[in-house]
Swiss-Prot record:
Residues involved in CTP binding: S13, D146, I147, E148, K186, T187, K188, P189, T190, Q191, K222
Record-given protein name: CTP synthase
Residues reported to bind L-glutamine: G351, L379, G380, M381, Q382, E402, R469
Family in the record: Belongs to the CTP synthase family.
Organism field: Coxiella burnetii (strain CbuG_Q212)
Record-annotated active site: C378 (nucleophile), H514, E516
Subunit relationships: Homotetramer.
Residue numbers binding ATP: S14, L15, G16, K17, G18, I19, D71
GO cellular component terms, semicolon-separated: cytosol
Gene3D superfamilies recorded: 3.40.50.880, P-loop containing nucleotide triphosphate hydrolases
Leftover remarks: CTPSs have evolved a hybrid strategy for distinguishing between UTP and CTP. The overlapping regions of the product feedback inhibitory and substrate sites recognize a common feature in both compounds, the triphosphate moiety. To differentiate isosteric substrate and product pyrimidine rings, an additional pocket far from the expected kinase/ligase catalytic site, specifically recognizes the cytosine and ribose portions of the product inhibitor.
Cross-referenced HAMAP family: PyrG (MF_01227)
Amidoligase domain: annotated span: 1-265
Molecular-function annotations in GO: ATP binding; CTP synthase activity; glutaminase activity; identical protein binding; metal ion binding
Length: 555
């Protein structure tokens, strides 16, 4: 029997429902329970795949190829479960499926309404996503009071009636602000948020109160009194330097035990030693390295959420504080590579569109010519290919057909056919819809013997997640190999280039996939760990060069 924990948010958005849900999931998992997490998004897009990163932040890709909310990345980083397309759905997906059923005649000519048809579809999708888990944590996107969230809230209200309070539990996340002018903590926004939730028919069982500082006992008692929530169930969650402390903080306040008690679950004590080690390593670095992330969405760091977390994970596993310098590639186009001179390593992440492309190419050229560690991910690998073709293989004006359809040297072109990991041949062509038409999800990659990639991974075959439409053009790859480009990874059918490196460079790696999606704080990822180690080595080498003249004088 699956128990359901519904997490809602009030007062303001961006309080951290996803992190809180994932942290509670980590606690329950450490108590011996199998856990899954679902995210219900109230927007009408079918999925976030075609949304601007400035609007939505990162699109997280699941193993089975779904383009989902970035919160699923948090879920996978905190718990051991692998998310699928069933773990995230939107209002748009729900309505599309209901309308499809209506067109098919499934409702026998009935009038289709929000209640019961939309709410029934939501409940069915929740049950489907939760199937097989001891506990399903269901995060409802948006803020209580928003019109968009009402069908989801109505659906979970109905599930409480249908399943009872031994199988369902409501957690409400609210803001308890500190008003500096008055010098007071204000509980009124939380009171009104719970009042709004109760007007919908939902009484929260547990409150998680977000604040700048830990809540005093008097304020917790006041919140309990006015919200009809027992005082032990009013949890204080103040700001922390590392999100990986949160499972420990919530465990220490008894949240996991409180949940198990309310849901009548017999569970063991939570063993969070792994999380203690992660936090200790993050708080006590022995080294510092500066990494430039050269992209076009740098004004919103959530656009590269999994990437920044993967760099932090690599720092945890190398005892290094990773300082991330986000550099707009258009700024490099305007001001040149001067912006890169103080960094120890350069990373060019994925992206779409032609804006800022030449700045990324300059960054790749600067890294190649100056022996600076370079990590190109997805578009970042394609950028490295274009730069190498132009400046090492004498392919003047080489480009991707995404940016210049008439380029004389299309070293990167639309991928029209590939073999999925199930052995099925998938095809795409010009003019296909943008949504859901990319090469998506986990795909196997065969690594070249004696390559840097093979040494980093420690195995011959890996599976990594993809999200792209363009690939390296096999017709021109031979000329690039003659000039020193190494193809260190290929698709399992040998048709597609998955990884590249340079033999005459200290650390220059490109991959067509997104390794950041599978990095976790407890394990890290071999490519990111290798990249940070290379950055440290480059930093030490630079120090040695700078120290050399003074050493000569001493001699």
């Amino acid at each position: 029997m699956t128990r359901y924990i519904f997490i809602t948010g009030g007062v303001v958005s961006s309080l951290g429902k996803g992190i809180t849900s994932a942290s509670l999931g980590a606690i329950l998992e450490a108590q011996g329970l199998t856990v899954t997490l679902l995210k219900l998004d109230p927007y009408i897009n079918v999925d976030p795949g075609t949304m601007s990163p400035f609007q939505h932040g990162e699109v997280f890709v699941t193993e089975d190829g779904a383009e989902t909310d970035l919160d699923l990345g948090h879920y996978e980083r905190f718990v051991n479960a692998t998310m699928t397309r069933k773990n995230n759905f939107t209002t748009g997906r729900v309505y599309a499926d209901v309308i499809r059923k209506e067109r098919r005649g499934d409702y026998l000519g009935g009038t289709i309404q929000v209640i019961p048809h939309i709410t029934d579809e939501i409940k069915a999708k929740i049950r489907e996503g939760a199937d097989g888990a001891d506990v399903a944590l269901v995060e409802v996107g948006g803020t209580v009071g928003d019109i968009e969230s009402l069908p989801f809230l109505e659906a979970i209200r109905q599930m409480r009636i249908e399943l009872g309070d031994q199988q369902t539990l409501f957690i409400h996340l609210t803001l308890v602000p500190y008003v500096a002018v008055a010098g007071e903590i204000k509980t009124k926004p939380t009171q009104h948020s719970v009042k709004e939730l109760r007007s919908i028919g939902i009484q929260p069982d547990i409150l998680v109160c977000r604040s700048e500082q830990p809540l005093p006992d008097a304020e917790r008692a006041k919140i309990a009194l006015f919200t009809n929530v027992p005082e032990p169930s009013v949890i204080s969650l103040s700001d922390v330097k590392s999100i990986y402390e949160i499972p420990l903080i919530l465990r220490d306040q008894g949240l996991g035990n409180r949940v198990c008690e309310k849901l009548n679950i017999k569970a063991t004590a939570a063993d969070l030693d792994d999380w203690k080690k992660v936090v200790q390593a993050q708080k006590n670095p022995r080294h510092t390295v500066t990494v430039a992330v050269v992209g076009k969405y740098v004004d919103l760091e959530d656009s590269y959420k999994s990437l920044s977390e993967a760099l932090i994970h690599a720092g945890i596993h190398t005892q290094t504080r990773v300082v991330i310098e986000y550099i707009d590639s258009e700024a490099i186009e305007l001001h040149g590579t001067e912006l890169l001179k103080k960094v120890d390593a350069i990373l060019v992440p994925g992206g779409f569109g032609s804006r800022g492309i030449e700045g990324k190419i300059l960054a790749a050229q600067y890294a190649r010519e100056n022996g600076i560690p370079y990590f190109g991910i997805c578009l970042g690998m394609q950028i490295a290919i274009i730069e190498f073709a132009r400046h090492k293989a004498q392919m003047e004006n080489a480009n991707s057909t995404e940016f210049d359809p008439k380029t004389p040297f299309p070293v990167v072109a639309l991928v029209s056919e590939w073999m999925a990991k199930e052995g099925i041949i998938e095809k795409r062509k010009w003019g296909d819809d943008l949504g859901g038409t990319m090469r998506l999800g986990g795909q196997p990659c065969r690594l070249k013997i004696d390559s840097l990639a093979r040494r980093l991974y420690g195995e011959d075959r890996v599976i990594e997640r993809h999200r792209h439409r363009y690939e390296v053009n096999n017709d021109l790859i031979g000329e690039l190999e003659k000039k020193g480009l190494v193809i260190s990874g290929r698709s399992i059918d040998d048709r597609l280039v998955e990884m590249i490196e340079l033999a005459d460079h200290p650390w220059f790696v490109g991959c067509q996939f997104h390794p950041e999606f599978t990095s976790t704080p407890r394990k890290g990822h071999p490519l990111f760990i290798g990249f940070i180690k290379a950055g440290l080595a480059a930093k030490e080498a630079k120090k040695a060069v700078l120290a050399a003249p003074s050493q000569e004088k001493t001699d």
